[in-house]
Amino acid sequence: MNSRPTPSPFSPVQIGPLTLKNRFIKAATNEGMSAGGVPSKQLVKLHSALVAGGTALTTVAYCAVSDDGRTLPNQLTLSQSSLPHFRALTEGVHQAGGLVSAQITHGGCFTFIRERSTKRPLSASGGFNKIGMMSGMFLKQKMNEADMQQVIRDFAQGARLAREAGFDAVEIHMGHGYLLSQFISPMYNKRRDQYGGSLENRLRFPRRVLRAVLDAVGQEMAVICKYSVTEGARAGNTAEDGAQIARMLEEEGAHLLVLSAGMNAESITTMFGSSFPKENRVQQKNKIIALAMAIQRRTEPTVEFRELYLLEHARKVRAAVKMPLAYLGGAKSLASIERIMAEGFDLVAMGRVLLAENDYVDKLASGASRDSICTACNRCVAMMYTPGGTSCVLNKPGDAELNRQPAGG
């Protein structure tokens, strides 16, 4: 247990140069509200409602730092042309009384985009692209030093564009099987140079990205890293590795770590803490690929949700570092949130709970509610593909008309 005084979850907290009014973060979740690669008015409505409902910092998910860095068509992309739409989003959040973070990312070989500047999707190592089973892109390309330099520049520029757009923080996505995670994970990184082998070597490139972002915006914005504490797969990083990763990111100067888990392809249930309904799966037209994916699904364990399902792993990180940490993973009651604070975590990040109840934080603060209505069914994930974008199935669907309109239009 933590020996420090236990703060109230409703008390302010300092993250780098940023002061949050309380300790609640809306975790990044792909909302499907970015037609044409820019925020829609529905996305502005959602994030404004989240902070109006009490959340101190809301996170806009999956902002690609380049066209090559996209995973999905119509994914949010930070560029000069998209800035007016991002500004409309940040202005809406600020007017609603909250702060907003841009999650900046590069998909690497986890991509459904065939148009790119390289022959194959980039990754830590080349060869067979197992995550390409979902997209039909079966080969990936090993990054060389020039590729790394370009991606580092892209992340730094993405952070500067986020600052110009009015964001208060940037969250570097280092987990879940995207590019930086592909370097960190021994499942993906088979290099034999200074960027492969030991965990220290596998962190070398992600640390360079973090350093470039800190140098670019770290004096004006909070710089956050989200990563998978445990990958939940036999050949992947464990929580003990996750604790070492945290030490290195702390040493490099990150202002906050958001502690997640799992990988999109190998261990999605580790990430979400519960099984996925059949309708949540990507539908594949190629019969051979569809068969391979069906076989993979049959081997997945059935996982029943339990609150704070990642706490055992996150404790190992808390014991390893002194820096601020945000716990993510199954907090859906006041009792769980208070336990997180008592365990020494500085903030709590929530995704599904806040999609179900945008005003859950205010309900907790006023005493109107203790337990979330969220059932952890994971159907909100599939809702990102509907015309109105992500929403909880217990509520009304998102506004399809607003979701067709660019935020800055």
Task: Enumerate the language-model features and the residues they cover.
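Flavin-dependent oxidoreductase catalytic cores
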Residues: M1-G409
